[in-house]
Each structure stands twice: as structure tokens, then as C-alpha cells.
Amino acid sequence: MNLNYLLLLSINASIKAGKEIMNIYSTDFIVDNKKNDSPLTLADKKSNSIIELALKNTRIPYLSEEGKSITYEERKYWEYLWIIDPLDGTKEFVKRNGEFTVNIALIKNNKPIMGVIYVPCTN
């Protein structure tokens, strides 16, 4: 496993997702609510799709806040796992205060070994 390659892939995915988030940020976007009453926007969904597509070829499974739910029983023996929060701070995004990030982490044997935090508003 080439960690430098995976790091660059994660950085590029987060930047691309961040650009899409910022495209939506300047529009009159609609805010939906998830089952737990937390907000969900088109920016969450598009960012998630961009990141999932970018990481797909790594063949490492992923767990995303905006993706399907995977039980711990199903994933506890996975050697590697991506954890994605495609728009961390959706409430702040909705408030348009700039305090939100794109987060991607790589987990190996239940321990984080790499992470990317990208702040779209400040690049």
C-alpha cells in the first residue's frame, strides 16, 4: 500500500469536493433534514459523490456520514477503511459562516494512519 499515493489522492479529492461545495455555497440551496434532524444539502451529497468516486479505485471500503450505514460487526475485521465526512459542519455551511471542512481519514486495524482536513473557504 503506497501511503504517499493515497495521501495525494485524498488531498486532491478533498480539494475537488471543496470546490463543488463552494459552487453551491453561493447559491440559494435547499436544506433537507436527515432522520436525526441534522441538516443535509446538495453540497453534502455532491461532495460525498466526488470523494467516493475518487477513492473507489483504491478498493478500500469506506464509511461516510452521507453514505450507507455499515455496522461495526461488518467492518471490525477490515484491515483498511476510509472514513469520510464530506461536509463537516453543515449547520455552519447553512449559516454561511465559513466554518466547515472536508474530512477524509484512512484507518488501518482500527487506528487512524492518515487524515486530510480541507477548509474550502480558505483553500
Regions found by a protein language model. Name each.
Residues 1-87:
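N-terminal subdomain of lithium-sensitive/metallo-dependent phosphomonoesterases centered on the IMPase/IPPase/PAP
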Residues 75-123:
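DPxDG-like acidic metal-binding loop motif
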